Amino acid sequence: MPDWKLQSSNEVMLLEAYGDSPAFDALLKATGRGARRDSPVDQDCIDAKNSVDNNDLEILHAPPGYAFFPSFFSLSRQFPTDGLTFISPCYMGLHNNVSTPEMKLRAHDWPPQTPDFVTHDVLATYIQDTAAAYDVLSNISFRTRVDKAEKKGSKWEVQSSRLVDGEIETAVQQFDALIVASGHYHAPNIPDYPNLPAWKSAFPSRITHSKVYRSPTPFAGKNVLVIGAGVSSTDICRELGSVAAKIWQSSRGGEYDLLPSMLPENCTRVGGIASFSTLTSTSLLHNTAPIPGSVILSSGEELKNIHHVILATGYHMSYPFLPHLHDDNATPEHANEEILVTTGQITHNLHKDIFYIPDPSLAFIGVPYHVATFSLFEFQAMCVAAILSGSSSLPGQQEMRKEYVERIAKKGVGRAFHSLKDDEGEIAYVREMVGIVNQGKKEGEKVEGHSKEWFEAYGRRLVRMKEKRGRKVEVEVKEKVAGPAEAVQNEGVK
């Protein structure tokens, strides 16, 4: 097994943030690195614009959250042609639903009296204050996009472009290792329903993905079809309930669908979608006019007088800066031993959902889901640091491959592959991370895993998840604490 110890030169850390905390903003100004305009829920901006020029340099190099308008969307599985039309899946009413005690970083405490469930700006402030406290800012390149990354010889060659005073500056840099921490929620899943592309083409602002949803205000008095019945869909339906005239929520009866009892009174749970009808007109619609077509359900029922369709159909894996490791023509079952992405359901060929088996100098943070994100990703980062610094080591490639193949045989190559939702799944995974970090460490130097406070909060999470999905509660905890109603969204996903 090669030694993947990093040299001191060219070490880099990139962070992605969603709005500046006071401490972070102060550092930006003090270092002259410029302010960022990336609030994902700037309502004034939402109300002022209905379309954006995708070729505008400010948009092409904007952080996630700045560019989020429905006109950006293409109804294909591919990224937009500019490659950088990033849209942040964050809306005004978003709360965490995995509690703050579970997400607490070992490196930084939450402010005193922080509730278990908070708004997204509190979460952003916590991450940014952590970065400010540890001088992460000096290692961040803002308004920069990675265009391509490729291993050449013993180094990773990274091509990037940066917007400076309205002009694009390009750069090519070499690194000993590449760590990808770009997350799950950027490449929307678009279902292949007959005539859906025609509806989107004719009325682009009426057919959107949940990723661009920001607030219920634009849907006041309208009839809305929300496709999908998972956590994001249910959260959106609950918000729409106070303003929309009529809501339908389409469900295929999936494993992660929430209970219909959680929906507002003006929302009806219906079955899966069979097709979208042929449009009777493609003329410009008045704001109050419904779409001139209908949606046919699998049962044969027909939904009419629909003003808006929201596709709450999730996301798929995509790493557009690693095109040589994508094979969009292959099925997951036929992925070879080098490819990372096929249909986007999973990221292939990773050891422990982190290390690229053919070349562990490529590592990923944040691939597992149904977890307490911040804390689990911190354990992953500690594991990566231990391997790349040489203080710990990985098994040989043959052993890593054997473990990966056995895992596929057990879990399959569907979306459940990266899920740690099963009882003890997340706990066992963190134990593995800690085991790797502690290789060769003496007593007194070893890193500990989850804290007592984490386990108590985790027990409460299991209760909430099983109650919301109508399952028998098998886990007993002394204290049962439920989050606010808003905390239902994305339960166990983020």
Indicate residue ranges for each PLM-predicted region:
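Core beta-strand elements of the Rossmann-like FAD/NAD(P) dinucleotide-binding domain
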Residues: 164-177, 218, 297-308
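Glycine-rich dinucleotide-binding loop and its adjacent helix/turn
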Residues: 111, 119-123, 132, 136-139, ...
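A Rossmann-like FAD-binding core segment of flavoenzymes
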Residues: 238-334, 387-421, 426
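Rossmann-like dinucleotide/flavin-binding elements
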Residues: 211-249, 319, 343-389
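Conserved SAM/SAH-binding loop
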Residues: 143-147, 161-163, 211-214, 272-274, ...
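Glycine-rich active-site loop/strand segments that organize a redox cofactor
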Residues: 2-129, 153, 351-354, 400-425, ...
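C-terminal, flexible cofactor-proximal segment of oxidoreductases
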Residues: 349, 361-494
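Acidic, polar low-complexity intrinsically disordered regions
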Residues: 4, 24-27, 41-56, 66, ...
